């Protein structure tokens, strides 16, 4: 057996399916790469010891059925992993959590293997990657240039091919800027779509966990695992049942020439023009828009009372450990003292005005295409002018969470000096899957390698389009490989994903049914394991003809999924469960059938 040279999900899945390698071998190779700091120093704050990593490997099932089975990943060190210190790049502030963050729990449950905790700008405050006592990660293409921040180590770990994907966070652009500087994908989901429980906050009302990946396809696989409502996070939001999509011929907003700011970087300006042409080749029409209200909203993030949220997050540590913080971070957070409650409300009112002003833009376009940053800086430049140059890096990023947008950072080519440039696709909330689908077509049109890896983007699968029909959940004989699945496929139904119901459902094996069928019944107040199911998409006509054939005691109703969304689903009339065997404990119909040897 041998470990694949690249760790993109498509390659790993094929290697596992063929038996060419095992999760243990892949995890050991990821650990070996992580330990080699000669080319990419300062990536890690803590690498997990081999025994801890192998414990995650041993917990995997024998067969590779989980969506992220055996996929190595990294965790930004402001996100909790149970039993491992969370430092937020501030050693004196470190704590050891007893529970993992919700996003980490869900990734591990989906089969992913954590390798370690990555470096960041202290307290996730900065876009440069240079504000850490653990050193400054470098751009993978040139050691004199910054990696971007604050999720610096996570981006480098992916771009260098150490792990398949990595978690970051994003308040002002921390999940996008490092992607641009290292020629990879950075997806910042809709605010609240991924849980922030167990994520140490920068601005709690704005923060988003993010993912760095080699392709939009891989980022989409992580999205499917993490896009779920979390009752333990008061900022969690339920996604709409119908996922928004872009039309075949879409309109995308581009900056007016007079409003383009590249800070003297002519190469970046030229690459932005090329990106506009490239996205137009994917079926889009560029439309110039007024950037003023977006820029005004961006200015509020640091020149406004939202820095008070950063001060709240750090708490008494700010006052009791004056020498325990990076001096620039302390300066930024200390600015909170300038704002009072009146200023906070005034800023909220101004933001509402800016958001109102952007509506004219959203009536004219489906999405925006902006530079991720106007330029890139050498490390010595940032160190000599840390505040102003950091502000320059946020020129096109700081407004995104304030205005409740979803965003996808994708590569956009290289300057003549070999440094990468990136652009960001932005759309209103909950357009995440649509952005990834369009972004993967754009990325494929660009082609080339992802980061420093050998992964060829033009050979990567496209991220799936949002479903355009009626979503239907099936739990038994209509599952893939089961006797009645052809009733779906013959109607052109499209498989969307595997997931579970919310906890409040029971499953029964119905007697005297041919083929054998389960009955799913809602049980309010029941804290069950959730029942495994598949979600399919059917056209309205196909859905109507399908429902017409559903026999009693089966009915089509609505079911709540684990992510809080609601779809149409098979359910069972309660009378049919009288005397039936309850099989809820198996967690799903297939597990129950396997227990019978069927």
PLM regions with names:
Residues 5, 70, 82, 208, ...:
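Gly/Ser-rich, acidic/histidine-flanked active-site/gating loops
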Residues 20-28, 58, 264-290, 315-320, ...:
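Acyltransferase
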Residues 19, 70, 109, 163-164, ...:
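Glycine-rich, small-residue loops and helix-cap segments
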Residues 68-90, 247-255, 305-359, 364, ...:
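Short helix-loop capping/hinge segments that flank enzyme active sites or metal/cofactor-binding pockets
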Residues 188-270, 274, 293, 320, ...:
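A short helix-breaking turn/cap at a secondary-structure junction
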Residues 469, 480-506:
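Compact nucleic-acid interaction/catalytic patches
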Residues 2-171, 277, 282, 488-489:
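Gly/Ser-rich catalytic/binding loops embedded in alpha/beta enzyme cores
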Residues 100-101, 105-226, 401-424:
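Short glycine/serine-rich loop segments
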């Amino acid at each position: 057996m041998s470990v694949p040279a690249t760790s993109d999900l498509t390659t790993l899945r094929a290697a596992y399916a063929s038996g060419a390698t095992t999760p243990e071998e892949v995890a050991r190779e990821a650990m070996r790469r992580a330990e080699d700091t000669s080319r990419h120093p300062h990536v890690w704050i803590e690498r997990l010891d081999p025994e801890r990593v192998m414990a995650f490997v041993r917990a995997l099932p024998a067969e590779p059925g989980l969506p992220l089975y055996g996929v190595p990943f990294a965790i930004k060190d402001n996100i909790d992993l149970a039993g491992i210190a969370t430092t937020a790049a501030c050693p004196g502030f470190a704590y050891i959590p007893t529970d993992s963050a919700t996003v980490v729990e869900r990734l591990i449950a989906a089969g992913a293997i954590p390798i370690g905790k990555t470096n960041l700008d202290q307290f996730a405050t900065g876009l440069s990657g240079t504000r850490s006592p653990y050193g400054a990660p470098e751009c993978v293409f040139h050691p004199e240039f910054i990696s971007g921040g604050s999720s610096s180590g996570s981006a480098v770990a992916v771009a260098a091919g150490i792990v398949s994907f990595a978690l970051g966070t994003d308040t002002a652009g921390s999940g996008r800027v490092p992607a641009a500087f290292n020629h990879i994908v950075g997806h910042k989901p809709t605010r609240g779509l991924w849980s922030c429980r167990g994520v140490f906050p920068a601005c709690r009302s704005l923060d988003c966990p993010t993912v760095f990946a080699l392709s939009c396809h891989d980022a989409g696989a992580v999205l499917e695992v993490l896009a779920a409502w979390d009752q333990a996070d008061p900022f969690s939001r339920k996604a709409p049942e119908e996922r928004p999509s872009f039309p075949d011929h879409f309109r995308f907003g581009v900056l007016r020439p007079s409003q383009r700011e590249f800070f003297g970087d002519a190469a970046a300006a030229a690459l932005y023009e090329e990106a506009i042409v490239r996205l137009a080749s994917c079926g889009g029409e560029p439309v110039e828009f007024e950037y003023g209200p977006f820029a005004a909203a961006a200015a509020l993030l640091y020149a406004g009372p939202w820095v008070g949220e950063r001060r709240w997050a750090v708490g008494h540590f700010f006052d009791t450990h004056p020498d325990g913080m990076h001096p620039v971070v302390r300066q930024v957070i200390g600015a909170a003292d300038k704002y009072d409650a009146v200023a906070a409300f005034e800023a909220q009112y101004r933001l509402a005005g800016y958001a109102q002003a952007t509506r004219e833009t959203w009536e004219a376009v489906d999405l925006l295409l902006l530079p991720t940053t106007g330029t890139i800086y050498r490390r010595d430049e940032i160190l000599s002018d840390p505040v102003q140059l950091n502000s320059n890096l946020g020129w096109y990023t700081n407004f995104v969470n304030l205005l409740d947008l979803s965003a996808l950072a994708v590569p956009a080519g290289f300057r003549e000096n070999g440094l990468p440039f990136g652009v960001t696709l932005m759309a209103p909330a909950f357009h995440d899957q649509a952005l990834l689908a369009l972004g993967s077509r754009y990325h494929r049109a660009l082609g080339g390698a992802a980061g420093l890896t050998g992964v060829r983007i033009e050979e990567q699968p496209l991220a799936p389009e949002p479903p355009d029909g009626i979503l239907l959940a099936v739990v038994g004989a209509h599952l893939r490989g089961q006797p009645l699945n052809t009733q779906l496929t013959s109607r052109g139904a499209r498989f969307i994903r595997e997931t579970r119901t919310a906890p409040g459902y029971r499953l029964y094996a119905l007697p005297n049914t041919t083929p054998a069928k389960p009955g799913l019944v809602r049980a309010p107040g029941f804290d069950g394991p959730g029942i495994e199911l598949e979600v399919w998409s059917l056209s309205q006509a196909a859905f109507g003809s399908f429902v017409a054939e559903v026999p009693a005691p089966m009915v089509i109703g609505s079911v709540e999924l684990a992510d809080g969304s609601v779809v149409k689903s098979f359910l069972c009339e309660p009378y049919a469960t009288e005397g039936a065997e309850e099989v809820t404990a198996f967690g799903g119909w297939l597990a129950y059938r396997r227990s019978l040897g069927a």
